[in-house]
């Protein structure tokens, strides 16, 4: 039995799919990780975003980040399953080493949470409308 290591997986799902299909694909991603010995610790579904460049003629993708513990021998099966899933445009699995985790904790400690650009533009519009009324 190998020691389970901490990994982070970023998945970009075809943003042109319906919400139900995206949710079903996320369930498939979770199931593939679990079937290959992975214990999911955290899932962050970012949502639909415009990609920097088209992938397979798709310009919008639904992003998700998954932290899981798993054996290194199971990664090949996970990658193969993701590669053959037509709804997954791109994926990346990274081993989270100790120095990287320490750096992440420091960043979280000293950083301020900033919303998405869409949230900021709505807040700016609200502030401008309040200022205009005064």
Curated annotation (Swiss-Prot):
<dbReference type="InterPro" id="IPR035980">
    <property type="entry name" value="Ribosomal_bS6_sf"/>
</dbReference>
<comment type="similarity">
    <text>Belongs to the bacterial ribosomal protein bS6 family.</text>
</comment>
<dbReference type="GO" id="GO:1990904">
    <property type="term" value="C:ribonucleoprotein complex"/>
</dbReference>
<comment type="function">
    <text>Binds together with bS18 to 16S ribosomal RNA.</text>
</comment>
<dbReference type="InterPro" id="IPR014717">
    <property type="entry name" value="Transl_elong_EF1B/ribsomal_bS6"/>
</dbReference>
<keyword id="KW-0689">Ribosomal protein</keyword>
<dbReference type="Pfam" id="PF01250">
    <property type="entry name" value="Ribosomal_S6"/>
</dbReference>
<keyword id="KW-0694">RNA-binding</keyword>
<dbReference type="InterPro" id="IPR020814">
    <property type="entry name" value="Ribosomal_S6_plastid/chlpt"/>
</dbReference>
<protein>
    <recommendedName>
        <fullName>Small ribosomal subunit protein bS6</fullName>
    </recommendedName>
</protein>
<dbReference type="InterPro" id="IPR000529">
    <property type="entry name" value="Ribosomal_bS6"/>
</dbReference>
<dbReference type="GO" id="GO:0003735">
    <property type="term" value="F:structural constituent of ribosome"/>
</dbReference>
<keyword id="KW-0687">Ribonucleoprotein</keyword>
<dbReference type="GO" id="GO:0006412">
    <property type="term" value="P:translation"/>
</dbReference>
<keyword id="KW-0699">rRNA-binding</keyword>
<dbReference type="GO" id="GO:0005840">
    <property type="term" value="C:ribosome"/>
</dbReference>
<dbReference type="GO" id="GO:0019843">
    <property type="term" value="F:rRNA binding"/>
</dbReference>
């Amino acid at each position: 039995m190998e020691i389970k290591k901490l990994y982070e997986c970023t998945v970009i799902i075809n943003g042109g799919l319906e919400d139900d299909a995206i949710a079903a694909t996320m369930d498939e991603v979770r199931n593939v990780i679990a079937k290959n010995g992975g214990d999911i610790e955290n899932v962050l579904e970012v949502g639909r975003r415009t990609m920097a460049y088209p992938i397979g003629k798709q310009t919008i993708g639904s992003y998700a980040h998954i932290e899981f513990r798993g054996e290194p021998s199971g990664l090949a099966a996970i990658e193969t399953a993701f590669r053959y899933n037509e709804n997954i445009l791109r994926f990346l699995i990274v081993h989270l080493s100790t120095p990287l985790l320490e750096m992440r904790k420091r960043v979280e400690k000293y950083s301020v949470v900033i919303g998405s650009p869409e949230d900021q533009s709505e807040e700016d519009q609200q502030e401008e409308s309040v200022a205009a009324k005064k």
